[in-house]
Amino acid sequence: MKILRKNHPLLKIINHSFIDLPTPSNISSWWNFGSLLGMCLMIQILTGLFLAMHYTSDTTTAFSSVAHICRDVNYGWLIRYLHANGASMFFICLFIHVGRGIYYGSYALSETWNIGIILFLMTMATAFVGYVLPWGQMSFWGATVITNLLSAIPYIGSTLVEWIWGGFSVDKATLTRFFAFHFILPFIIAAFALVHLLFLHETGSNNPSGLNSDSDKIPFHPYYTTKDLLGIFLLLLVLMILALFFPDVLGDPDNFTPANPLNTPAHIKPEWYFLFAYAILRSIPNKLGGVLALVLSILILAAFPLLNTSKQHGLIFRPVTQVIYWIFIANLLVLTWIGGQPVEYPFTMIGQIASITYFAIITILMPISNTIENNIIKL
């Protein structure tokens, strides 16, 4: 068996990736979230596949087909709620995974980091088009508002929006193509995740100390497979508690009403995991400026390898940047809260301050703290 897994063309790839992979001996539980993301993706693809068997992407029947899944399909309610709450778990793991990458300086592995950003954007796109499918009020108006942002692009904006809509408003053509995108994108994400792993295994994993760990590596199996299994069981436990006891806690009450183009909800807002970006979008009065800020709020992650001037890897021995990092996390939570609030004083002002802080921390405060810490080392 040992010879087979080391020599067989297919098993050899699995062996080098998950069994005999040399791994730093000191990586903490913060490194578990990569495998948890893989688990989330598998859950989403499986539950999504079963939902797609019963869902109809037609404006007249989409809402009732989701109700039919919950009422008439065997365990359809469970599959639907696992899928809906699985998306929330996916994004929780994703935010922690990116946060760990920033804290421990994993962005130094630039190819892995940049593919990670592409994965992040694709996951956001998948979640957005997926939210439109139940065809409730918030689905319809969320799709209308967010796709309409593209009209801010000079010259081609209006044409682009109508091209995406497949008509002059969000309608049957839009729903059909969004269903097609929602079905295909997770498989593209899975392919990119493999490329993400490929680049990671070229350089080897980072570790909490930020030091070179070539002299102290252990095989991935059994040490980290068992550790990952614990993380997976905990993730499944939280997901099952969410799906069985609080299935609608992260949803929007407006989505229990079928889509009605003649009735606008009081507060149009996306799912909770987009609220931070939505708050940044809303904090700029100019439409094009808001769209640019929205895109930059994610793409700015690509600036981390370029702006890092520190002589140390990661923040574990850098108290000044540690304080700034935790202010950054708190600021993100404030943005998430503001994104769900109505557009009125004082929320608009808090949102504008938090948006400026978000970009200032990454582009100004962190590079300054890097320089300060470099000078402290010289003393």
From Swiss-Prot:
Cofactor(s) of this protein: heme b
GO molecular function, one term: ubiquinol-cytochrome-c reductase activity
Protein topology in the membrane: Multi-pass membrane protein
Presence of keyword Transmembrane: yes
PROSITE patterns given in the database record: CYTB_CTER, CYTB_NTER
Listed Pfam families: Cytochrom_B_C, Cytochrome_B
Textual note on the cofactor: Binds 2 heme b groups non-covalently.
TM helices/strands, residue ranges: 33-53, 77-98, 113-133, 178-198, 226-246, 288-308, 320-340, 347-367
Highest taxon in the source lineage: Eukaryota
Ligand binding (heme b b562): H83, H182
Binding of a ubiquinone, residues: H201
Gene3D superfamilies the UniProt entry points to: Cytochrome Bc1 Complex, Chain C
Sequence positions that bind heme b b566: H97, H196
Subcellular location: Mitochondrion inner membrane
GO cellular component: mitochondrial inner membrane; respiratory chain complex III
Subunit and partners: The cytochrome bc1 complex contains 11 subunits: 3 respiratory subunits (MT-CYB, CYC1 and UQCRFS1), 2 core proteins (UQCRC1 and UQCRC2) and 6 low-molecular weight proteins (UQCRH/QCR6, UQCRB/QCR7, UQCRQ/QCR8, UQCR10/QCR9, UQCR11/QCR10 and a cleavage product of UQCRFS1). This cytochrome bc1 complex then forms a dimer.
UniProt miscellaneous comment: Heme 1 (or BL or b562) is low-potential and absorbs at about 562 nm, and heme 2 (or BH or b566) is high-potential and absorbs at about 566 nm.
Function: Component of the ubiquinol-cytochrome c reductase complex (complex III or cytochrome b-c1 complex) that is part of the mitochondrial respiratory chain. The b-c1 complex mediates electron transfer from ubiquinol to cytochrome c. Contributes to the generation of a proton gradient across the mitochondrial membrane that is then used for ATP synthesis.
Protein name: Cytochrome b
Gene this protein is translated from: MT-CYB
